[in-house]
Amino acid sequence: MIDSEGFRPNVGIILANDNGQVLWAKRIGHNAWQFPQGGIHFGETPEQALYRELREEVGLLPEHVQIIAQTKGWLRYRLPHRYIRPDSDPVCIGQKQKWFLLKLTASTRHIQLNLSDPPEFDEWQWVSYWYPLGQVVNFKRDVYRKAMMELCMLLPQQQTFEKSSL
């Protein structure tokens, strides 16, 4: 599903633990790390897509997490030209994302990367909240910054993070 401007609707997921760290996952077959994310299917709400992607990519169910916040609007990024397929119909030029901040309420033993075929990720780790900004691929960096800035303000009071490397 691609909108009239060429953007694919998508959800981004920032999953935090009790220590204020976030789940950071490595794409299978690549040396690229990112937050879990995925497309919104036709007829699906962003929240429904969030739970489907969470299950497919990291094995978590709705009862394993709590939604803390979501971005007010859609955040967009354009794909580099090398990733655009001009012969597809319609042509996708980027993604528009609704971001969610979640808190893990279950044990990490519920995190499973092998539930989809093929799996999206082959490794994961907990990292400090702002760490991903310096690590994510360049074309996603601005969206990550905007989502993280908006959502960090909505974290529970006991969660504090240093905004280093912004």
Curated annotation (Swiss-Prot):
Record-linked InterPro entries: Nudix_hydrolase, NUDIX_hydrolase-like_dom_sf, NUDIX_hydrolase_CS, NUDIX_hydrolase_dom, RppH
Organism of this sequence: Acinetobacter baylyi (strain ATCC 33305 / BD413 / ADP1)
Annotated Nudix hydrolase domain residues: 6-149
Pfam families hit by this protein: NUDIX
Domain of life: Bacteria
UniProt-recorded Gene Ontology molecular function terms: pyrophosphatase activity
Protein name: RNA pyrophosphohydrolase
Cofactors (names): a divalent metal cation
Function statement: Accelerates the degradation of transcripts by removing pyrophosphate from the 5'-end of triphosphorylated RNA, leading to a more labile monophosphorylated state that can stimulate subsequent ribonuclease cleavage.
Renumbered ranges of motif Nudix box: 38-59
The keyword Secreted is assigned to this record: no
EC number: 3.6.1.-
Keywords: Hydrolase
N-terminal signal peptide: none
